[in-house]
Amino acid sequence: KKDAKWSNGDEVTAQDFVTSFEHEVDPTSKSQIASDFKYFKNYNAVQSGKMKPSALGVKALSEKKLQITLSKRQPWLNDILASKGYPINTAAFKKYGSKYGTSSAKTVTNGAYKLVNWNGTSDDWEYVKNTHYWDAKNVKINKVAVQVVKEPGTAQNLFTSGKVQETALSGTY
């Protein structure tokens, strides 16, 4: 998308998708979705460690143009790209390395919201409107507070009292 930007103001580029795909397929990342990209050229060699992730069949042809080379036809490629083909902010990923995404301070997003007030282990955090989002003017909710509640009784009480708008309840409640 031409106007897509990261929450830090950087433009989303084709290289951000390359970085993401290479990271997902890199065996050291232990990604649970790596096999979704098994039809990308050199997937098996990269997954087995015989080739570097940079040998994967993805290449940024320009700032906004991405080339994906497949080892064989994949009829559901569009579905996979729409649901699993998320970019990673390349500059932030290089800066934070394995710590990227481990806290809100080390996470850069490109959606309607950015993650704040999460330290990587806390049970609550917030999503605040991303002012750099391409369609920010149509994002009507400025902040979403998330709280993980581990006890079903507590969740039910919070919901009943109106302190939370949504919760998962067990059959007991």
Model-predicted segments: where are they?
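Second-shell loop/turn segments in exported
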Residues: 2-8, 54-56, 144-145
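Aromatic- and charge-enriched surface segment that lines or borders ligand/interaction sites
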Residues: 1-33, 67, 161
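Gly/Pro-rich hinge or "lid" segments in bacterial periplasmic/extracellular proteins
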Residues: 70-139, 143
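Solvent-exposed coil/turn segments that connect beta secondary-structure elements
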Residues: 3, 17, 22, 63-64, ...
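Surface-exposed binding/hinge segments that line
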Residues: 16-18, 33-91
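Ligand-site clamp/hinge motif
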Residues: 132-173
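Extracytoplasmic/secreted proteins, especially bacterial periplasmic and envelope-associated proteins
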Residues: 12, 16-23, 38, 53, ...
